[in-house]
Amino acid sequence: MITNLADYPLLSQINIPEDLRNMPQEQLTRISNELRSFLLNSVSKSSGHFASGLGTIELTVALHYVYNTPFDHLIWDVGHQAYPHKILTGRRDQLHTIRQKGGLHPFPWREESEYDTLSVGHSSTSISAALGLAVAAEKEAKNRKTVAVIGDGAMTAGMAFEALNHAGDIKKDMLIILNDNDMSISKNVGALNNHLAKLLSGSIFTGFRESSKKLLGNIPPIKELASRAEEHLKGMVVPSTFFEELGFNYIGPIDGHDVESLVTTIKNMRNLKGPQFLHVVTTKGKGYQAAEQDPIKYHAVPKFNPEETNLPQSKPSLPTYSKIFGDWLCKTAEIDKKLVAVTPAMAEGSGMVEFSQRFPDQYYDVAIAEQHSVTYAAGLAIGGLKPVVAIYSSFLQRGYDQFIHDVAIQNLPVMFAIDRAGIVGADGATHQGVFDLSFLRCIPNTVIMAPSNERECQLMLNTGYKLDGPSVVRYPRGNGTGEILPSVDETIELGKGVTILTATVIESQEQTNKSIAILSFGSMLGEAKKAALELNATLVDMRFVKPLDETLIDTLNAKHDCLVTVEDNAIAGGAGSGVNEYLLAQGKPVTILNIGVTDHFVKHGTQEEMHHELELDAEGIVIKIKRFIN
């Protein structure tokens, strides 16, 4: 995609932040406007995360204008809002490739640019990393500054508050910027507040405060009186002094779209000692009315026409697994009032919006708090309810100890509906769901099911929901295959797979040809079936990763020369490893090939592209099997 840079006379001159810093401050508003226009033009033609970046235009310009990046460390939490940062740091002309195979990474990524201090993707990591960098900078003694930008959503995670608590305790020089685009914790935004922020962060006030502390430090009553006077002044127009109690110097809230006020305030705060906290209020989707009105809808967008008021509708397709899960929740809740559904801030992505509206008393969004969500569900189960935790595969990693300690050890009936299992696609390494089978399979008391289509998915949801212990149903991102769904009371037998294809015996076949049985786990069945037909192989849908269908495995091993396991999880510790362990424990001779994700992190690209690259499509499966048996 070729962009006419003549439409952006100032932005076209900015190839690195140093170019920005060489421009007069009075031009920053024009630069911000051009940057917002460029972002809109680029993402609308290529797709990508959208509304968050529109909301951080002025903040991004101000930070790169004030700080000497990349020498100074700038960290973006999660990274959805970092598109403007990428544009200003040498990646403007590649932005149209973002989230595409071989293109720019969807989030800040250390391998991509020296300006990306921390690789991110999951929320709430920025403050911890920034604190570590601040400690290292102090030891380095080169006056290197550290800044972390975190959103109000990410601030709900326990990890963020753990880091704030530590930072306030050890009091290293650092700046935390809260990008509050929800307006939920700050209403006092305007000229008076911006003026107060400049005043409280300015050298006269801070100098007076520090001098007073030194002068009056040995007179506790007077020191306390001075502190109370300062807090009274702040308290007239700012929110709670919670962050001050943690040990931070709190400034704000201020208008995050007034770039000159941002520059003035950040300049004032740059050289302050100790932990600083700046509260900035922004509008998600700023500058594009449709995104401002519906920031969730415009959080990530397909290609669209900015002149039109609606995003293009995708062509009618089969329901997604998320939709199938959401419908199952509603159907089950209609007949069982004990069902309760828990999600850590993923209602839209997990297909739970309708359920939340129809059954608000049975729905709990606990915010970005994966650890809490799991133990909260344990409490619900102990209390006699029937909890279902809807969570992405990559996010369940954060609740691992709670899964073991609070659910599995106590053998509680909590069902986990694990969405985005397997190869997710464009969000890259941080979001690929390729580890859940490996870290869950070793946990006692746990039943793990992997559906091959939407009918199997609902059967497994029905089955897991009725179990009196922990269960997991893991399903992929994407659409079903058009199967007819069962009723909500239909279940399947635990630990039993099904045979899909039986190899044809050819009398004239040479003895050198090996008979093959493919054991498919989960959504790989479609590609495995194509491979089995080409190879004249037996194919089974294993259904269960735990407990395995040991009888079926024994039968297949006895009747075939070679077994092949196929899964969209890491080979190490995955479903295939479970088959290996069982057969080796029997002491039986076996020739077995495990096909799955090898020992590396999967990059970004479409699901189809990554399956092909990993040789997890039908063509790749055939190649791997032929290579192995020959």
From Swiss-Prot:
Binds 1 Mg(2+) ion per subunit. Binds 1 thiamine pyrophosphate per subunit. Gene3D superfamilies: 3.40.50.920, 3.40.50.970. InterPro entries: Dxylulose-5-P_synthase (IPR005477), THDP-binding (IPR029061), Transketo_C/PFOR_II (IPR009014), Transketolase-like_Pyr-bd (IPR005475), Transketolase_BS (IPR020826), Transketolase_C (IPR033248), Transketolase_CS (IPR049557). It is an enzyme of class 2 (transferase). Thiamine diphosphate binds at H80, G121, H122, S123, G153, A154, N181, Y288, E370. Its EC number is 2.2.1.7. Transmembrane segments: none annotated. One of its GO terms (molecular function) is thiamine pyrophosphate binding. Mg(2+) binds at D152, N181. It catalyses: D-glyceraldehyde 3-phosphate + pyruvate + H(+) = 1-deoxy-D-xylulose 5-phosphate + CO2. The keyword Plastid does not apply. SUPFAM superfamilies: Thiamin diphosphate-binding fold (THDP-binding), TK C-terminal domain-like. The keyword Magnesium applies. Keywords: Isoprene biosynthesis, Magnesium, Metal-binding, Thiamine biosynthesis, Thiamine pyrophosphate, Transferase. Pathway: Metabolic intermediate biosynthesis; 1-deoxy-D-xylulose 5-phosphate biosynthesis; 1-deoxy-D-xylulose 5-phosphate from D-glyceraldehyde 3-phosphate and pyruvate: step 1/1. Its cofactor is Mg(2+); thiamine diphosphate. GO terms for biological process: 1-deoxy-D-xylulose 5-phosphate biosynthetic process; isopentenyl diphosphate biosynthetic process, methylerythritol 4-phosphate pathway; terpenoid biosynthetic process; thiamine biosynthetic process. Pfam families: DXP_synthase_N, Transket_pyr, Transketolase_C. Belongs to the transketolase family. DXPS subfamily. Catalyzes the acyloin condensation reaction between C atoms 2 and 3 of pyruvate and glyceraldehyde 3-phosphate to yield 1-deoxy-D-xylulose-5-phosphate (DXP). This is 1-deoxy-D-xylulose-5-phosphate synthase. It comes from Colwellia psychrerythraea (strain 34H / ATCC BAA-681) (Vibrio psychroerythus).
